[in-house]
Amino acid sequence: MGFDDMRRFCEMHDRKIPVFASPATMKGLRNTFRYVFDEPQVWKNYLRIDPEEITAPFQLGETTIVPVDLPHGRFTTTGYVLHRGGRKLVAYFTDCSRVPGEAVEAAHGAEVLILDTLRDTPHPTHMNFEQALEASRSISPGTTYLIHLCHEVSHADKEGALPSGCHLAYDGLTIKAGM
């Protein structure tokens, strides 16, 4: 599930990791990874977290982070829109099967949109290319990066077929926003 993989960072830095999640997600994490939430934790190599339930926009430094509910099949995930200096810098929408109107409105005009796109054909919990490109058009970002691509997607074939300002993300990609 990936969550437990963060324990290495606790070992390296000898401190807790802040974890931001919706109340429903936090409940699921507590049920699945009970030992992480139990105090005291006697093993240094256990994942140690500082849980923070997200129920409203919050601040990290000068950045305001606005949580946005997104459908992921029958579940709800959380996307984020990052604001700084009155500008929408980044909208991060992954693990979603569509982008509802409230999320489109929250992200509209963001400088960068990072958007879930699994493959060409429909999928019950992720957007396909057609759905993602429609969501991108509705949001009207400066640049869109499509993420969460499956093994069926050929970067060489797809990248050239995308509309202007839309790109396939890749491992190691660095995105600059608000510069």
Predicted features and spans:
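Cap/insert and terminal regions of metallo-dependent hydrolase folds
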Residues: S97-G178
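Binuclear metal-dependent hydrolase catalytic cores
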Residues: M1-F93, A156-M179
